[in-house]
Each structure stands twice: as structure tokens, then as C-alpha cells.
Amino acid sequence: MAPGVHPFDIPVLRDGLSFELTRPVTFLVGENGSGKSTLLEGLAWSVGFGAHGGNRDHQFTEATDGHALGRALRLGWRQRTTDGFFLRAETFYNFASHLEEAGSNFSRYGGASFMAKSHGEAFLALFEHRFEDGFYILDEPEAALSPQRQLAFLRILHQLTAPRIAQFVIATHSPILLAFPGATVLSLDDGSIREVEYRDTSHYQLTRDFLLAPERYFRYLFDDADGDAPGAV
């Protein structure tokens, strides 16, 4: 590692980090910029997936941050696997375009091109038809999923992990996904990586408090905005 050089200047990476994946599902939470996506890119590169998404067969232009961190990571395995997938919501279009250009047989993905589906439909088709045993790294999958489809994803997650045939590491802001039973939740805030309880996350607490009393939040947000407006008394 080169201290002070990006991405090793990210607080959670500055002094090195070590963690274990002891359960089938591990969630990473933290504010934007805390290092979640960079850590996932590094994991993906270390496993052999493209740092922009896909599996070992889908190598696109590498992301510098993920490449640098991936070279520094040292992974220990109980049973090493190269099967799996790295899903990034923001670059999923690149993966779908790659399949189109390669003339892929979409029977492996539910029978229809991803380009003929909505973003959320394409995600679920990938989850249902291509996720089996292996190591899966997902970066904010909720970005393309409505609340109802997030529930559908949780069902797929249960089907894959109940027999312990798959391992998932998922970065998310979704309190719905974070509620998955038996998952480990790791926070990357405050410059360290530590396990937290689902109900202790700001994602859960803020969503719960807002839904219970939205008017209180509107008063706080809008009164400040009105006070800053030109001509406000």
C-alpha cells in the first residue's frame, strides 16, 4: 500500500483493514465516500471479476481504485471459488451492451434481452437465472428495484443462501434489504469497519422516524430553507 495515495487515503483504508465473512450475507453500510464501492471493486478484482461489473468472462476497462486496492488485498478462503458475479447498478448497462454485442443467448438470462426489460426487470432476471453457487458482490442493487422488487430480491437471496451454496457481499442504503434475517451488517463510517445491529443503523432509524412523524422533519427542513430565502423575515 501507498499511504496517502488514493484510494488508501480513504479513512477506512488508511490504517489497513481486516474482516471476516462468517455468514452467507454481509451488508456494507456507510455514507457516500466511506469506501463501500471502492472496497467492492477491490474484492471483485481480487476474485477475478471485472472491476466495472460482470464475472470472469466480462473484463472491461479496469477501475483504477479497484485495481490498486485489489492488488493490496489478501483474501483467505475456506473453499476458493471463481464462480459468481460483480453487479454495479451504475455500470449494468455496459454489461447488458456487452451481451448484445457478443450475440449472447439470452436463454441463460430468462429468454429475453436485458435491453427489452426495465432496469428492475433486468436485475431480477439476472438474479433468478444466473445466480447459483458462488461469490456475489453487489453494489447498491436497490438503485433499480422498487420496494416490491426489493422484497422479491430478498426471496431470491433466501433461496440461494438457506442451503449455504452462495456468499453475498452487498453495499446498500436500503433498510428493506438490511432487514434480511441472519445477515452481518458492517459499518464503514467513522474511519473503521465494525459490525452493527440492523436497528442501530441510521438507515433504519431515520426511515422509521421519518415515516412516524414526517411533519416534524418537514418543519425542520423547510423552516430553515424559508429563513434563508431572500426577503425572509
Name what the model sees in each region.
Residues 113-140, 148-163:
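GG-anchored amphipathic helix commonly corresponding to the ABC/SMC/Rad50 NBD signature/C-loop
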Residues 23-27, 37-101:
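ABC ATPase nucleotide-binding domain signature region
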Residues 148, 152-233:
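C-terminal lobe/lid and adjacent interdomain/linker elements of RecA-like ASCE P-loop ATPase modules
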Residues 1-17:
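N-terminal pre-Walker A segment at the start of P-loop NTPase domains
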Residues 33-34:
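ATP-binding Walker
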Residues 13-23, 129-131, 162:
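Phosphate-binding P-loop
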Residues 30:
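The Walker A (P-loop) glycine that initiates the GxxxxGKT/S ATP-binding motif of P-loop NTPases
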